[in-house]
Every structure is written in C-alpha cells, then in structure tokens.
Amino acid sequence: MPMYNFDFNRSVTNLNLSAARSGILTPAITSLELREEKLRRFNEVVQRVAPDRPAFKAEQIAGAARRVLRAAMKGQESTFIKVRMRRAGEIRAALGDAHWEVAAKTEPAMREIVAYLDESASALIDNDVPVVGLLDDAILVDAAMDGLRGELDDYADFCRYRIGEAARLGILPNEVKTRRECWFHERQQELRLELQLRRVRAANYGKSASTAPGFRIC
C-alpha cells in the first residue's frame, strides 16, 4: 500500500518527515496511508457517478492532500473541500426534500455519493484524519459535478421560489404546498412573459425609430 510522507520543503513525496528534521510543524499529520483496495473501491464509485472520468492514481490523491496541508500551514481553509462539501449538503437536501422529485438521470449518482460519504469505514481517507479527512469526499463530489450541476442549480432555484411563495402567503417555507412540476410551470410562464415583453419592446423601438422625423435641409 502506498504511504506518503509529506515534506513541504521538497516537491517529492517519498521523504521521511519529522518536525525536528524539517523544521516545519505540520498540522497534526505527517503521513497519509492510501490502501490499494480502498483506492480501487473509490475509483469504482467514481466510475459510477462520472463514467467519463479517468481513474485517480494514489499520487494524485497525495498531491491534492499536500496542497491542502500547505494551505492549512498558512492558516488557510481549503476552499476546494469547503465548496464541494457544501455541494454534498445540497445533494442530501434535494434527496430528502419531499416536495422535490430528483430527476431520474441524476438520482443514482446522487445516492451513490451520499452512500460513500456515509460509509466512513470503507472510505479512502478516514474522516478523522486531521485537515484532509474529507478530501476524498470532496474529490468524489467534484468528479460528479458536471453531471449534477444542472439538477442542483434547479433545486436551488426551487428553494428560492418556495421562500418567495412563503413570504407572499405569510407562512413558513416548509408549509408551502408546491412541487417540482409547479415550480417548473411557473418558471416557464415567467420565461414566456419575459420573451413577450422583449418582443414588444423591440417592436416599439423599431416603430419609433422608423417614424422619427428626420433633418430637413433648406
């Protein structure tokens, strides 16, 4: 199984690191163990949620972990992990929302991601590893985002619509009796109205431009 020792003064990975030797105090982690069987399972999940994505190599995961740790040493939070885990929260919310029917083409991948996140015992990186414990989760979400972005953006718009309806009716958002098809119908109506208004404005502009008096030279 690959064992990666992190020396942040050097670009190579297979170096022994201790605080005394390097003069660097790493954020509570000096090595990362990537078991071959767990990497194989991780790549199987990646293949199911993102069929076009090539399999990850251990060196790629180690390189990503090194970058996260370097940022942590500077007191910086990993934006990569933070943003992808927020997306993971959106996936959970969409799947758990009784008023939102997840599209059939994206539901399997979304459930696959949630299942991986919840099975910490078989995760590529243990969740309790300092700083990088959620890195594999974030990488999995990132790999699937090309196929899920549209669905999650639609769900976010549905939530905004539901909040607006709640404000209009004077009730709580979870009391709004609306579903995906209602939201879609309303948005289609809004789109048709917007297109109609654009055509009217364009017609009026063309009419006023053609009837405007020109200059007369005497």
PLM regions and their residue ranges:
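Terminal, membrane-proximal amphipathic helices
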Residues: 1-109, 146-218
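Membrane-inserting effector segments that mediate pore formation, membrane fusion
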Residues: 108, 112-141
